[in-house]
């Protein structure tokens, strides 16, 4: 699919990326689109929550650790709390896999977040093929 044609390349998995920096978000989005991932970009916790409630096709959340209006862990705990409150057939929020992207490569921090339930902790610079492999593990 050519960019000039106006057509969108077919995608197979829809991911939400809650990002802190525009430049890295667009680079990651372009790389993921080449591998048939639709990466929805949002830049705040508030916007992420809105998208998650509205879009039932989102399969996984990628989230920068530090955001303009809070942290990835605040979003993670909010989503888990809301999902746990609804024990019904079609809850408003599903327990989506949650990945944290960060420059902090402290093993103790990674252990703490994984212990709390975060599915993956990826340090910068992001290795795109490795990220895709990890994402596919959770969405396929």
Residue ranges and their predicted role:
Residues 47, 68, 104-108:
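Negatively charged, flexible loop motifs adjacent to catalytic sites
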Residues 41-60:
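Acidic, metal-coordinating helix/loop segments flanking the phosphotransfer/catalytic sites
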Residues 1-31, 35, 46, 77, ...:
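Non-catalytic signal-transmission and effector/linker regions of two-component phosphorelay proteins
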């Amino acid at each position: 699919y050519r960019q000039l044609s106006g057509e969108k390349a077919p995608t197979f998995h829809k991911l939400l990326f809650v990002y802190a920096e525009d430049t890295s978000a667009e680079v990651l989005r372009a790389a993921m689109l080449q591998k048939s991932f639709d990466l929805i970009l949002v830049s705040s916790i508030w916007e992420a929550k809105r998208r998650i409630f509205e879009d039932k096709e989102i399969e996984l959340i990628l989230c920068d650790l530090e955001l303009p209006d809070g942290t990835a862990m605040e979003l993670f705990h909010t989503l888990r709390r809301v999902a746990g409150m609804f024990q019904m057939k079609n809850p408003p929020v599903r327990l989506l896999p949650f990945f944290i992207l960060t420059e902090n490569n402290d093993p103790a921090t990674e252990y703490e977040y994984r212990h709390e339930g975060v599915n993956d902790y990826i340090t910068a610079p992001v290795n795109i093929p490795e990220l895709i492999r990890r994402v596919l593990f959770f969405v396929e």
